[in-house]
A protein has these predicted regions:
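Conserved alpha-helical scaffold segments that buttress catalytic/binding sites
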Residues: 1-313
Length: 313
């Protein structure tokens, strides 16, 4: 897990998700029709590294000063801001290396590795490790956002930059299939339209297709057809409709439902493709309302089960 939320640009708190998801997981029944008996293959959680959480807390204070400075119209080349940005970027790079080393260790033992964030910057090291191991793969990216911004707010490893960084740095990633996106800038729209590696199934287009009579099964076939044989799933909880994640850091109206996304992931597994790794990010737990963690735990269990099912097929 990566209890880390340094670069969040709106609401914080996703660094607390790993603990909350473990707690919520105790309310799960083991039978899963998507992958019956998959849990018998073994699902384990590595110990949470609370030193990461503490480093995140310290760097988050720097990030808040940077964001406030920029929002107030301050110059990005202010010397104090540059010092803070340097600390943040160095800290995020170290976090990525930490995750990368852990992932390589587990992958070398033949494990299927998933990561629980944390914000959406956290899976970079895992994606890198899985990409290097597999040689070639595609990413199924479920999200309200494209995450194709370059160094958003000056943060080289921003949660809004994860897919920009992946496409720039990892030639093994042959395809990025984005589903549910509905909040993005002109530059991201232009990038998605011009880069042949990107297939975007935005929330508006999916909804309009449904209104015009296209079934969700037909839409899922189109989505899955874009994916290569080896798939990594990057699941930002805010890709779901807002009742499933009311406290996530950057909530956006619209999206896809829990049942729709489960069907989509089942279609990936049913197609014979192999899920080689995954992440679940941007879950923000709330002490007064457990729904974010409850939904997150169930998404995570589905990801684990389907990954195990496809790895043993």
């Amino acid at each position: 897990s990566a209890p880390w939320d340094v670069t969040v640009s709106y609401g914080a708190g996703t660094a607390l998700a790993p603990d909350a998801l473990i707690e919520a997981s105790t309310q799960l029944d083991l039978y899963d029709a998507s992958a019956p008996g998959a849990w018998l293959g073994g699902i384990a959680t590595a110990d949470i590294d609370y030193s990461l959480q503490e480093e995140s807390r310290k760097l988050r204070a720097d990030a808040e000063r940077v964001i406030e400075h920029l929002e107030e119209g301050g110059a990005p080349d202010d010397e104090r801001i540059e010092r803070r940005l340097r600390r943040i970027n160095e800290g995020c790079a170290a976090m990525n290396d930490n995750i990368y080393r852990q992932a390589r260790q587990w992958l070398s033992q033949g494990k299927v590795v998933g990561l629980v964030g944390g914000d959406h910057s956290t899976p970079y090291g895992l994606i890198r490790a899985v990409a290097e191991k597999e040689g070639s793969l595609g990413i199924l990216h479920i999200d309200a956002h494209c995450d194709l911004r370059e160094a958003y707010e000056g943060f080289e490893f921003s949660h809004a930059s994860i897919m920009f960084n992946v496409l720039r740095d990892l030639p093994q990633v042959s395809k990025l299939v984005q589903v549910g996106v509905r909040d993005y800038c002109d530059a991201e729209a232009e990038r998605a339209a011009s880069d042949g590696r990107i297939a975007m199934f935005d929330s508006r287009s999916l909804a309009r297709a449904g209104f015009a009579g296209t079934t969700w099964a037909e839409s899922c076939r189109r989505i899955v057809d874009e994916l290569p044989e080896v798939v990594y799933i990057s699941f930002d909880i805010d890709g779901l409709t807002i009742e499933h994640c009311p406290h996530t850091g950057t909530p956006v109206p619209g999206g896809i439902t829990f049942e729709q996304v489960v069907y989509l992931m089942e279609c990936v597994a049913d197609s014979g493709r192999r899920i080689a790794g995954f992440d679940l990010v941007e879950v923000v737990p709330c002490p007064e309302d457990k729904i974010d963690a409850v939904v997150g735990a169930r998404v995570l269990y589905k990801l684990c089960g389907l990954a195990l099912r496809t790895s043993s097929a």
